[in-house]
């Protein structure tokens, strides 16, 4: 049976199979079909998490590749190996083309289907955060006007998500915390604003700490995990100089979190 003929439930099941097989490109295809079938109704929590996980894995592999290649490129430039640098730049360009295609794919889906169909505050924040995330991934490697546009679009999406999150979601809500985590990473990495990054992360952490006793048992694990990541970043950012080049800035976990999971 061709995947185009599958029902919504069957596409969801096939996406789960693809996830188990670690075939994330196909997982994306199955979940895109699901997303495009729901013009007026929202995806379920399970469906939106499957879509997010699929794209996070597909983009994550390329982001990791890009970072490795960029690091090698810097080393070869430092050694004056111009012939190798030319080869590396071409190869990096190939990865950047893939990154752009992936980001464009999910951003188009968010614009055309997911954001317009969302009504619950939780799902609105989830999708606007996702929109900000993928514009941020573009800003990581784009240059000039393209980088500026990507950064501006990231800010608009995160700010819209933040406005709803602060008004509608509890400080301990995993999606609100995940937004604060990624928004602060954007300030630190893309806008080079460590003070603003620390301020945002600290405020989110402190507000969640003050309401920790109100956390439901289902959300406790998810929320405290993201709080730990916020704390890790604050520790990293507030230290004068990080001696360890292997230290990584933490983002919201690959498996996007929601209540009850």
Curated annotation (Swiss-Prot):
Q: Which GO terms describe its cellular component?
A: cytoplasm; nucleus
* Signal sequence, renumbered to the chain: none
Report the InterPro entries cross-referenced here.
14-3-3 (IPR000308), 14-3-3_CS (IPR023409), 14-3-3_dom_sf (IPR036815), 14-3-3_domain (IPR023410)
Gene Ontology biological process = protein localization; regulation of gene expression; signal transduction
Q: Which GO terms describe its molecular function?
A: DNA binding; protein-containing complex binding
Q: Which Gene3D superfamilies match?
A: 14-3-3 domain
Function, as annotated, reads:
Is associated with a DNA binding complex to bind to the G box, a well-characterized cis-acting DNA regulatory element found in plant genes.
UniProt lists the family membership as follows: Belongs to the 14-3-3 family.
Name this polypeptide is given: 14-3-3-like protein GF14-12
- Organism this protein belongs to: Zea mays (Maize)
> Gene behind this chain?
GRF2
């Amino acid at each position: 049976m061709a995947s185009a003929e599958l029902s919504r439930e069957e596409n969801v099941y096939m996406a789960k199979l693809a996830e188990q097989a670690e075939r994330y490109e196909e997982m994306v295809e199955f979940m895109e079909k699901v997303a495009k079938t729901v013009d007026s109704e929202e995806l379920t929590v399970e469906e939106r998490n499957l879509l997010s996980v699929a794209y996070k894995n597909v983009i994550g592999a390329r982001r990791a590749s890009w970072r490795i290649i960029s690091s090698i490129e810097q080393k070869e430039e430092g050694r004056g190996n111009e012939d190798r640098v030319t080869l590396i730049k071409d190869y990096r360009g190939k990865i950047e083309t893939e990154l752009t295609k992936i980001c464009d794919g999910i951003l188009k889906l968010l614009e055309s289907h997911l954001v317009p169909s969302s009504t619950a505050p939780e799902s609105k924040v989830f999708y606007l955060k996702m929109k900000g995330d993928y514009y941020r991934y573009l800003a990581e490697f784009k240059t000039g006007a393209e980088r500026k546009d990507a950064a501006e679009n990231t800010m608009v999406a995160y700010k819209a998500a933040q406005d709803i999150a602060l008004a509608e979601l509890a400080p301990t809500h995993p999606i609100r915390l995940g937004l604060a985590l990624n928004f602060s990473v954007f300030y630190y990495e893309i806008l080079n604003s460590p003070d603003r990054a620390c301020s945002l992360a600290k405020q989110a952490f402190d507000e969640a700490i003050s309401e920790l006793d109100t956390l439901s048992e289902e959300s406790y694990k998810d929320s405290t995990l993201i709080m730990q990541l916020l704390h890790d970043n604050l520790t990293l950012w507030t230290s004068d100089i990080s001696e360890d080049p292997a230290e990584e800035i933490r983002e919201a976990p690959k498996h996007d979190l929601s209540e009850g999971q």
